[in-house]
């Protein structure tokens, strides 16, 4: 079982007087910066010119170029998209790190897969809240917190663990609990969850169910409701209390169908395929493929995305959601 740390386990003064640079001001960046500031950390924000720059300034932060922020900071937290981190690190962060600094991430992808190679004389750790930035911020302001993971990759100063816990405490995570892990474990489990279950697995299952009903002659609108729309109701029940809460809450007919039909859909063959997915994550095959795809301009990514956006389930869904303004997205979806 994971070791869990709380507020009482933190050396609160280990980052006292240290300057923290938050590189990036998106979902996680704004939450980290604001929570740290509210906990009396000395925070600056490092960005390239754009909307985020203006937003950070509006929120009252001193904003600098990434290079300037990295040069003045003792702790540099990189909260950029995975695919952008290596370029920004090599161009603007690496040469500005000083001995004894801390280089921090919220996901281990680039360090674990050797896209970022930190100097040997800096501490390297990750602090990864297990929730989106808006939730990290909202729960903090309400006196609560989102749990987080932390891991130490390199302990150059002998105090990397203490710094990681102090940072986690600064964003409020120790109120809920901070679980110790490794860069390898965090990266590989995160990627597996996304690919086999949360994104890849669920979308493939939803589409397969929809197509099965439509191919059998059922109206696509009903297929959409049964295989996609109602998924949120079930996931919310699991989120609140696990599988047992979902099974307690649905009808006995639905629960019996779960027991007798679920194992026929997700079979041992499915688990073997999941094992293959995990192996490709572990041996770096997935990372190499994604890095190459990004460097080539993402031709397959964009082609698949465009095709998926025109699947019948999406066409029908867009029409049905016009009937349900309460589920309309708050942000633009579709092409990236």
Curated annotation (Swiss-Prot):
EC number: 1.1.1.86
Key words, A-Z: Amino-acid biosynthesis, Branched-chain amino acid biosynthesis, Magnesium, Metal-binding, NADP, Oxidoreductase
Pathway(s) the chain acts in: Amino-acid biosynthesis; L-isoleucine biosynthesis; L-isoleucine from 2-oxobutanoate: step 2/4; Amino-acid biosynthesis; L-valine biosynthesis; L-valine from pyruvate: step 2/4
Domain of life per record: Bacteria
InterPro entries, sorted: 6-PGluconate_DH-like_C_sf, KARI, KARI_C, KARI_N, KARI_prok, NAD(P)-bd_dom_sf
Transferase in keyword set: no
GO molecular function: ketol-acid reductoisomerase activity; magnesium ion binding; NADP binding
Residues at the active site: 107
GO CC terms of this entry: cytosol
PROSITE patterns from the UniProt entry: KARI_C, KARI_N
Cofactor requirements of the protein: Mg(2+)
Catalytic activity: (2R)-2,3-dihydroxy-3-methylbutanoate + NADP(+) = (2S)-2-acetolactate + NADPH + H(+); (2R,3R)-2,3-dihydroxy-3-methylpentanoate + NADP(+) = (S)-2-ethyl-2-hydroxy-3-oxobutanoate + NADPH + H(+)
Residue ranges occupied by any KARI C-terminal knotted domain in the UniProt entry: 182-327
Cofactor binding description: Binds 2 magnesium ions per subunit.
UniProt: substrate binding residues: 251
Binding site for Mg(2+) 1: 190, 194
Residues involved in NADP(+) binding: 25-28, 48, 52, 82-85, 133
Gene3D superfamilies: 6.10.240.10, NAD(P)-binding Rossmann-like Domain (3.40.50.720)
Its biological purpose: Involved in the biosynthesis of branched-chain amino acids (BCAA). Catalyzes an alkyl-migration followed by a ketol-acid reduction of (S)-2-acetolactate (S2AL) to yield (R)-2,3-dihydroxy-isovalerate. In the isomerase reaction, S2AL is rearranged via a Mg-dependent methyl migration to produce 3-hydroxy-3-methyl-2-ketobutyrate (HMKB). In the reductase reaction, this 2-ketoacid undergoes a metal-dependent reduction by NADPH to yield (R)-2,3-dihydroxy-isovalerate.
Classification via NCBIfam families: ilvC, PRK05479.1, PRK13403.1
Annotated protein name in UniProt: Ketol-acid reductoisomerase (NADP(+))
Species whose genome carries this gene: Bacillus cytotoxicus (strain DSM 22905 / CIP 110041 / 391-98 / NVH 391-98)
């Amino acid at each position: 079982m994971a070791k869990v740390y709380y507020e009482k386990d933190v050396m609160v003064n280990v980052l006292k007087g240290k300057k923290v640079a938050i590189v990036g001001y998106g979902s996680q960046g704004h939450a980290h910066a604001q929570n740290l500031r509210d906990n009396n950390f000395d925070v600056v924000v490092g960005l390239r010119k754009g909307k985020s720059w203006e937003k950070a300034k509006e929120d009252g932060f001193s904003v600098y170029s990434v290079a300037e922020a990295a040069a003045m900071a003792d702790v540099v937290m990189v909260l950029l998209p995975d695919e952008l981190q290596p370029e920004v690190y090599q161009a603007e962060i690496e040469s500005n790190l000083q001995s004894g600094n801390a280089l921090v991430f919220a996901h281990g992808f680039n360090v674990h897969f050797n896209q970022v190679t930190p100097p040997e004389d800096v501490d390297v750790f990750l602090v990864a809240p297990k929730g989106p930035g808006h939730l990290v911020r909202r729960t903090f302001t309400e006196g609560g917190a989102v749990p987080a993971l932390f891991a130490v990759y390199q302990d150059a100063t002998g105090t990397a663990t203490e710094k990681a816990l102090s940072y986690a405490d600064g964003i409020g995570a120790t109120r809920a609990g901070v679980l110790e892990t490794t860069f390898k474990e965090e990266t590989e489990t995160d990627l597996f969850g996304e690919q086999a279950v949360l994104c890849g697995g669920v979308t493939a299952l939803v589409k397969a169910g929809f197509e099965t009903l439509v191919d059998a002659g059922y109206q696509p609108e009903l297929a959409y409701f049964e295989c996609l729309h109602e998924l949120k109701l079930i996931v919310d029940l699991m989120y609140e209390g696990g599988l047992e809460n979902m099974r307690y809450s649905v009808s006995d007919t639905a629960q019996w169908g779960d027991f007798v039909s679920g194992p026929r859909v997700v079979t041992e063959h499915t688990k073997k395929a999941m094992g293959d997915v995990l192996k490709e994550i572990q041996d770096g095959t997935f990372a190499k493929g994604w890095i190459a795809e990004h460097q080539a301009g993402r031709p397959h990514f964009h082609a698949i995305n465009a095709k998926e956006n025109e699947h019948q389930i999406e066409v029908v869904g867009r029409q049905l959601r016009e009937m349900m303004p309460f589920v309309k997205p708050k942000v633009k979806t579709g092409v990236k």
